[in-house]
Amino acid sequence: MFVKKGDKVRVIAGKDKGTEAVVLKALPKVNKVVVEGVGMIKKHQKPNAENPQGAIVEKEAPIHVSNVQVLDKNGVAGRVGYKVVDGKKVRYSKKSGEVLD
């Protein structure tokens, strides 16, 4: 998967299209990512010892990795490629040619 935790991404599809934010979690087995402030859902929490009333909590839901593009250091969104530099495999932006790792 071309997206890693901590990457700055732009959402390119869905209700949050155009939003730029940081990846909080990458889920490679299901090809999804959790992006900060994107795909917010309301989760109903049952009452428990620390919260006897229960609550409705807003949290980020995973979105499909094809709906985001990685931003390079200049803020340019583009596809990601891989190349070997000094015997080490690194990710780079195909649009700007800049190394991402």
Curated annotation (Swiss-Prot):
Pfam families noted in UniProt: KOW, ribosomal_L24
Membrane-traversing stretches: none
InterPro entries cross-referenced by the UniProt entry: KOW, Rib_uL2_dom2, Ribosomal_uL24, Ribosomal_uL24_CS, Ribosomal_uL24_KOW, Translation_prot_SH3-like_sf
Top-rank lineage group of the source organism: Bacteria
An example Gene Ontology biological process: translation
SMART domains found in the cross-reference section: KOW (SM00739)
UniProt keyword ATP-binding present: no
GO terms under cellular component: ribonucleoprotein complex; ribosome
Keywords for the protein's UniProt record, in alphabetical order: Ribonucleoprotein, Ribosomal protein, RNA-binding, rRNA-binding
Keyword Metal-binding: no
GO molecular function: rRNA binding; structural constituent of ribosome
Function: One of two assembly initiator proteins, it binds directly to the 5'-end of the 23S rRNA, where it nucleates assembly of the 50S subunit.
UniProt subunit comment: Part of the 50S ribosomal subunit.
NCBIfam families in UniProt: rplX_bact
Family: Belongs to the universal ribosomal protein uL24 family.
Protein name per the record: Large ribosomal subunit protein uL24
UniProt organism field: Streptococcus uberis (strain ATCC BAA-854 / 0140J)
